[in-house]
């Protein structure tokens, strides 16, 4: 697909998957706008693009990002909602063990960041006959991340919101792509060499996630799965839920015995 002079806006764009997305789109001719808590302005210089310090939990800042992008570069053709945060079950490692503040932050970033992006980017796209909205969720949004109930729950919500966008606006020209990787070599993995449970099927580079996303856009498929086994796991989860839950409990016991913590 030719992205020459297309405008691509990316949240969480200063590093990791977001930066890899920017590199992939720019290599195909796109103009790039990046937003992040820090580093966006510096990262955008590599693309002669727009960089903005922005927090997706603040409605006005998301609106400003859309407005500034369109004022500087033109109408947004592709919006990538990539900003995310990993909240675990610490300190108790009970499923309800995370603080209310951590649950709320996961909700505000992992779900509402996408909702606010759509709220402000989609109306203009609709007036122009359509656009592309990418939500970077996680395999945890289809399965579960052991030791991280807030992350799992809010990534499930992000997948559901992506589906809702497609159902509500697909007939109006909106193409929605939902990206659901397992382990990706980003800061979210921390210091773990093997990625812990997230790396059970191997760790991929952010560039691989970007390439799979571009392929999904070109092939007009809803899911972009950098780890293909995720599709099989989801099928098993849906068709054999009790077996899947039992397998996940067994896996949690194994991780706990090896590491003393589930993540």
Where are these regions (language model features)?
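Active-site helix of classical SDR
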Residues: 118, 154
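The beta1-alpha1 cofactor-binding region of Rossmann-like NAD(H)/NADP(H)-dependent oxidoreductases
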Residues: 54-64, 100
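Substrate-binding pocket helix/loop in short-chain dehydrogenase/reductase
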Residues: 90-104
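Conserved glycine-rich Rossmann-like NAD(P)H-binding loop of the short-chain dehydrogenase/reductase
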Residues: 28-42
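Residue(s) in the substrate-gating loop at a strand-loop-helix junction
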Residues: 138
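Active-site-adjacent segment of SDR/Rossmann-fold oxidoreductases
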Residues: 143, 164-175
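C-terminal tail/cap regions
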Residues: 195-196, 200-263
């Amino acid at each position: 697909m030719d992205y020459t002079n297309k405008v691509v806006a990316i949240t969480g764009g200063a590093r990791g998957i977001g930066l890899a997305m920017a590199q992939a789109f720019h290599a195909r001719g796109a103009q790039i706008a990046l937003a992040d808590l820090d580093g966006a302005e510096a990262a955008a210089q590599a693309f002669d693009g727009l960089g903005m310090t922005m927090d997706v939990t603040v409605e006005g800042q998301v609106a400003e990002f859309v407005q500034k992008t369109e004022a500087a570069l033109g109408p947004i053709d592709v919006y990538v909602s990539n900003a995310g945060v990993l909240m675990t079950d610490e300190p108790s490692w009970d499923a309800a063990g995370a603080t209310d503040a951590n649950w709320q932050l996961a909700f505000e970033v992992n779900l509402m960041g996408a909702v606010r992006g759509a709220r402000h980017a989609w109306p203009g796209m609709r007036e122009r006959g359509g656009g592309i909205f990418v939500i970077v969720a996680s395999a945890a949004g289809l399965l579960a991340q052991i030791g991280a109930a807030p992350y799992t729950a809010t990534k499930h919500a992000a997948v559901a919101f992506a589906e809702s966008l497609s159902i509500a606006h697909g007939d109006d020209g909106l193409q929605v792509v939902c990206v659901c990787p397992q382990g990706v070599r980003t800061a979210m993995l921390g210091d773990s060499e093997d990625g812990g449970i997230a790396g059970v099927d191997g760790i991929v580079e952010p560039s691989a996630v970007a390439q799979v996303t571009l392929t999904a856009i070109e092939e007009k498929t809803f899911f972009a799965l950098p780890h293909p086994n995720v599709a099989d796991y989801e099928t098993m989860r849906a068709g054999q839920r009790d077996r899947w839950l039992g397998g996940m409990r067994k896996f949690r016991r194994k991780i706990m015995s090896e590491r003393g913590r589930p993540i």
